[in-house]
Amino acid sequence: MISNNLNIPTHNNQKSIRIQGHEYKMYPGGTIINFQDASASLGNILESEVVLSKYHLEVLKLSILSNPPQGSKELVETDFIASEKQLYYFYKTLNNIKNFENENSKLNESIAIHGRIIKPDIVNGIKASFVAAMNDNFNTTLAISEFLKVFKYSNALLNNANENPLHKLTTLNKIYENILTVANLLGIFLEEPEDFILEIKEKYINLNHIDMEEVKELMNLRQEAKSAKNYNLSDEIKAKLDQKGIIIRDSQFGSEWDIKELFEKGRLIL
């Protein structure tokens, strides 16, 4: 577990960043990584090795950032699993935005002249809400919850086929830019989205002993069934993949596979 019940001098654990010329400091409340009573330095070294052998560094960061600094909550394994899945969701959204930008790159030249931001309050509020959270005693928990609202809106916009593509592109470009500007200050979303997604998928494929050769074969058979309009067989194959821990998402852009467990309440990773 991560315990924050030890009083560590603030000069050892405060974190500072500068935003628009103002300095903000985060005090994790004596947060150390420790399974048993130990000194701050020993705990940090010991537990960092244990946690980072299981989880990406940004998962650890998100777990701490999501923990109220004034609270007495102790972070346990289930918190890391939840943060890993939330971070996966964030990176999936960022990757979907990048894919949409690539698919509509021909519209880029029109953005400056004809592009319109669909929800200015959401897009322009990203930086404003972040600064407000920092002014609220460096409330990183609030900042993360605001990120979640923006990502939910981004996914809704991506899935809205009735919205003007140029305005969607203009809006999503600005969301991507603003989110990275503030999130990078907290040390998250530093990876290339596609790289992070592949790393987490590979981890869960190994954890669940998923035979990807068999999965690929089933997906090809399903595609053939769909092409032949044999939808009953297509649904049967989809159900079989689900039993193997693979979910299939069909959209206007085709079919995409993902790891079922990443969208469920997870088990402990031992």
Give each language-model segment a name.
Residues 30, 37-270:
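Structural preference for alpha-helix termini/caps and helix-kink/transition segments
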Residues 1-43, 248:
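Active-site and channel-lining beta-strand-loop segments
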